[in-house]
Structure formats: structure tokens, C-alpha cells
């Protein structure tokens, strides 16, 4: 029991590391801080051609380093729709987080990791195995992202709309527990909107269709796009008065109603031929699956989280659309914290410092005794 007793308390006093493992971005830092120390793209880049010498001729590039050289690299994302699909790449990103982004030894810190709702059991097991066996962390815990987002806003009951780069989850949380049968997963999020905007820009004779252009289009989306309260009326306005945007090569493009058609996909996925419900319909559907006595409280505590919830106008539009589908006279409140891009990480930062949480960690000893299955017993 080498890490028990006083030594384990020393780890707790030192603090924990919190990693929000997003499809698009990794947010990592130290528990108790107000914001993550490191935020970097969750992407791996490999040279397209063996003959190319890239800088110091590394075989693999991670995060911003990969995006900076995207023209001569093949980019691959370890997560798809919130779920790990390439474990070798994911593990490289985690090692990079400790070695380069945080510059700490993993064996010195407990680690609180986030996961998507209903993460496959085998994925949780592989994760806990890697952190204990490869990184040698003293203790570990994995939390559902939506629960931490809600916790970071000071609540333990509510409905979380967590929309990042790879997936949107609508999650009912009651007293800090996910109600699994009421979860709605929508495979439509930031990356899909960026891809859709690539297509829409061709209408303006703007062709940014290569992999290396994708990051440019993402920046256009974040700077220019917004949600219209009245789509038809706003579309007319944008046909008369276009929005100018300067590209990296200093050329200027003009964008019309593409600025509102791009995020409109969240409410009308059929615009791109997707046979799925809009997020407003999924929200109402999740609330209907919850206990009838809980529904009023859920309608009044709809929390937005994640980078794709940052569009200007999203609060007002959601309120309008949900009001049209909720029971008459239902009071609706959409909570959109300014820092919602980092809500999940902030919730983890708060959680990992609580005195009441310290007995919840999976310790290295527990892992040695029980193996990977310990994650299902202790993290639920």
C-alpha cells in the first residue's frame, strides 16, 4: 500500500489535474484554478510524404503544432462524436498534455477526466488502464461532462445542452446524476457546421474546400455566424447588407445569409438532408422523458455548455422554439454563462477540490486489486 495514508494526503494537498477531453479541443489545468492552463486542438498530424522534411523532422505533430503545418500534414482526430476511435493517437495526446502543455509528471497528480454521456464501457476501461499502467497516476476519476457543466454553474439539477465540436448531448441531471433514459445524443455540432459553411461559401464564389482550409472556415464561422430570431426576415436583411471578412491572404470576401444559414442547421438539420431532430425538439423530448414532477424545474434550468453554444442569438432563439413546443404557460429559462465554452472544465476544477469528493477517487491500490472494472463501481 505504497501510496496510502500520509502520502496520499500529500497528493491531495498538491491538487489534481483536470482534463476535459473534447472532440475538438483538450482543456487541461489544475484543480482550483478559474480557467484551464492549456487549451489546444485534439488533433494529430503526420507528414503526407516520407521525403518531406518538416522542421526537426518529427514523425507526429500534436495540437496547434499540427494545425500550423496542416498544408503538409495529414490531420487525424482521435475522437469522433465524443468517443475515442483511435487509442494510439488519443494516448499520444494525453502524454503530450502532461509533457508539453502542463510540464508536470503524471505520477505526481491525481487526474480528473471527463467523458461523453453513455461512453462505451470498454472505452472507460481502456482509459483507466492507460492512466494507471502507462502514466502511473496515483488516483483517477472520470466524470460525465454534462454533470460537471451543471455543477460549474452552481446547480445539481437541470437540463444541459452540451454542444462542442463533435457531438451535441441533451442531458437531464437530477441531484448530480444523469438520467440515462432521457439523454438525447445529436451527431451534429461544431465540426458539422464548419463543413456546412464550406459548402455555403461556394455560393459566394469562395472555395475553401481543402483540409488545410478547414481551420480558416472555422474562424469565419466563429466570427461571422449568428442565429436569427426570425430566419426569413434576417435573410432578407443580409441579402441587402452583406458582411465583410478578411481572409489570411488579406483578400476580403462578402458573406450574405450564409451567416445565419450555417447555425440554422442546429434547428433544421434537414437543410443538409439530415433526418434528425433539431436541438429544440430534442430538449423538449428529453424533458418529456423525465419524471412529470421534475419537468417544470427542467424547463426553468436549461443550461448551455460548449463552444457551439456560443453563437450570438442562441438564447433567444431557443426560448422561442421551446415555447412553441412546451405545454401552455410554461416558464422557460435558458442559462448561458459567459464562460460556457469552459463550463465542463470549471465544474471539474471545483469538484476536484471539494473535501467531500476526496474519498471518491479511484486509487492505484484499488485499481491493482480490482482491475479496470473499478471504474464502473466508483464512477457512475
Locations of regions flagged by a protein language model:
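C-terminal region/appendage detector
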Residues: 1-380
Amino acid at each position: 500500500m505504497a501510496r496510502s495514508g500520509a502520502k496520499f494526503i500529500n497528493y491531495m494537498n498538491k491538487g489534481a489535474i483536470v482534463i476535459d477531453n473534447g472532440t475538438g479541443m483538450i482543456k487541461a489545468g489544475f484543480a482550483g484554478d478559474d480557467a484551464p492552463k492549456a487549451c489546444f486542438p485534439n488533433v494529430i498530424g503526420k507528414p503526407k510524404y516520407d521525403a518531406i522534411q518538416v522542421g526537426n523532422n518529427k514523425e507526429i505533430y500534436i495540437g496547434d503544432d499540427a494545425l500550423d503545418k496542416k498544408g503538409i500534414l495529414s490531420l487525424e482526430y482521435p475522437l469522433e462524436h465524443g468517443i475515442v476511435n483511435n487509442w494510439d493517437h488519443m494516448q499520444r495526446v494525453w502524454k503530450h498534455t502532461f509533457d508539453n502543455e502542463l510540464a508536470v509528471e503524471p505520477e505526481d497528480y491525481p487526474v480528473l477526466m471527463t467523458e461523453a454521456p453513455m461512453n462505451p464501457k470498454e472505452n472507460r476501461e481502456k482509459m483507466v488502464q492507460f492512466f494507471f499502467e502507462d502514466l502511473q497516476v496515483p488516483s483517477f476519476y472520470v466524470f460525465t461532462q454534462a454533470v460537471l457543466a451543471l455543477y460549474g454553474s452552481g446547480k445539481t439539477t437541470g437540463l444541459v445542452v452540451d454542444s462542442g465540436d463533435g457531438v451535441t448531448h441533451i442531458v437531464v441531471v437530477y441531484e448530480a446524476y444523469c438520467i440515462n433514459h432521457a439523454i438525447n445524443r445529436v451527431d451534429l455540432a461544431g465540426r458539422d457546421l464548419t463543413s456546412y459553411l464550406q459548402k455555403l461559401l461556394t455560393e459566394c464564389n469562395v472555395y475553401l474546400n481543402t483540409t488545410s482550409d478547414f481551420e480558416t472556415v472555422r474562424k469565419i464561422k466563429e466570427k461571422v455566424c449568428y442565429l436569427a430570431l426570425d430566419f426569413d426576415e434576417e435573410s432578407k436583411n443580409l441579402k441587402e447588407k452583406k458582411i465583410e471578412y478578411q481572409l489570411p491572404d488579406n483578400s476580403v470576401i462578402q458573406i450574405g445569409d450564409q451567416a445565419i444559414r450555417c447555425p440554422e442547421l442546429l434547428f433544421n438539420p434537414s437543410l443538409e438532408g439530415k433526418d434528425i431532430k433539431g436541438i429544440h425538439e430534442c430538449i423538449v423530448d428529453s424533458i418529456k422523458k423525465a419524471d412529470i414532477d421534475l419537468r417544470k424545474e427542467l424547463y426553468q434550468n436549461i443550461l448551455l455548455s460548449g463552444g457551439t453554444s456560443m453563437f450570438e442569438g442562441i438564447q433567444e432563439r431557443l426560448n422561442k422554439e421551446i415555447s412553441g413546443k412546451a405545454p401552455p404557460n410554461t416558464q422557460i429559462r435558458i442559462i448561458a454563462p459567459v464562460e460556457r465554452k469552459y463550463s465542463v472544465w470549471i465544474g471539474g476544477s471545483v469538484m476536484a477540490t471539494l473535501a467531500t469528493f476526496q474519498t471518491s477517487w479511484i486509487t492505484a491500490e484499488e485499481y491493482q486489486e480490482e482491475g479496470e472494472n473499478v471504474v464502473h463501481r466508483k464512477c457512475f
